[in-house]
Curated annotation (Swiss-Prot):
Its main location: other. Residues 1-24 form the signal peptide. NCBIfam families: PRK15209.1 (NF011756). This is Long polar fimbria protein A. One of its GO terms (biological process) is cell adhesion involved in single-species biofilm formation. It is found in: Fimbrium. Disulfide bonds: none annotated. Transmembrane segments: none annotated. It comes from Salmonella typhimurium (strain LT2 / SGSC1412 / ATCC 700720). The gene is lpfA. InterPro entries: Adhesion_dom_fimbrial, Adhesion_dom_fimbrial_sf, Adhesion_dom_sf, Bact_Fimbrial_Adh_Pro.
Length: 178
């Protein structure tokens, strides 16, 4: 009888361990973050255009021999969707952020440790015209449905001497309609 009792206790102990393991394997938690915005505008910005990263890549220092020298351009776009052009037919886009200290029409690269100096970032519209930081705008005629706004960006030398380092920056874009 004692042997049978030990066998039952062992079986119940094993079952408790297996049950706990199974329960632990099934438990878990997490967080779901919802973001969005309700707007009163002729178009909405496509979700894939709201937060973008434009990779300017590694650029050799020796291409910057004088103020105004540029790296190769990297394209990016802002997609507008569900455009209703019954009351507004044009969109103005401006870019806002920290302007370069030597050329305020350009975006300043971040000044953290290890940052490059002597360069800013230029943003150009589809006609290759510089959209001046904080003061400029590009205007595009809207199409019903979807309108894609095409831009390019590149590094621009703001000093005769450019130092190596990170060339990161961030800007906001703002839309206004007419």
């Amino acid at each position: 009888m004692e042997f049978l009792m030990k066998k039952v206790v062992f079986a119940l102990s094993a079952l408790a361990v297996v049950s706990t393991s199974a329960f632990a394997a099934e438990s878990g938690d997490g967080t779901i973050k919802f973001t969005g915005e309700i707007v009163d505008a002729p178009c909405v910005v496509s979700t894939d255009s709201q937060n973008q990263e434009v990779v300017l890549g590694q650029v050799k220092k020796n291409i910057f021999k004088a103020i105004g020298d540029k790296s190769s351009s990297k394209p990016f776009q802002i997609k507008l969707e569900d455009c209703d052009i019954t009351s507004n037919t044009k969109v103005n886009v401006s870019f806002n952020g920290v302007g370069d200290t030597d050329d305020a029409t350009l975006v300043s690269v971040n000044t953290e440790a290890g940052a490059a100096t002597g360069v800013g970032i230029g943003i150009y519209d589809n006609a290759n015209k510089l959209v001046e930081m904080n003061t400029g705008k590009s205007t595009t005629t809207l199409a019903a449905g979807q309108t894609v706004l095409y831009y390019t960006a590149n590094y621009v030398a703001t000093k005769d001497t450019v130092t190596t380092g990170y060339g990161n920056a961030e800007v906001d874009f703002n839309l206004s309609y007419e």
